[in-house]
């Protein structure tokens, strides 16, 4: 199913996912440090990065950006986001099982998207 998605549509899917992710970091994780064990400013920073990444996707069409460059940029940014989240998991001693589950789920979803974006990028590159 995901192979048939055009690069432009994949960029919009990424933008939507990054927006949802950012809002979850801000509104769910950031406001419930006792439940997730992730204290400020970490949720605000990760949420802000996700929202910033989403702008690239939302403005992709407005700015008439190259799909190849946008996909490559999103691949790099999404991978960096996952590395940051993984570092949080490895270094935060106060993180709860709910925080671990949310962060691990975030990494799985985003890295799956990175793999799909990489395949789309390679198909444009050839």
Task: Describe the role of every protein-language-model region.
Residues 88, 108-126:
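Membrane-water interface at the C-terminal end of transmembrane alpha helices
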Residues 48, 99-116:
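Small-residue-rich transmembrane alpha-helices that serve as helix-helix interface/gating elements
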Residues 62-65, 83-103, 120-122:
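Membrane-helix boundary connector in multi-pass membrane proteins
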Residues 36-43, 69-73, 96-106:
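Non-cytosolic membrane-interface motifs at loop->transmembrane helix junctions
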Residues 51-64:
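Canonical alpha-helical transmembrane segments
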Residues 72-88, 109:
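Hydrophobic alpha-helical membrane segments
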Residues 7-42:
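Membrane-helix boundary elements
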Residues 1-5:
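Short, Lys/Arg-rich, polar N-terminal cytosolic tail immediately upstream
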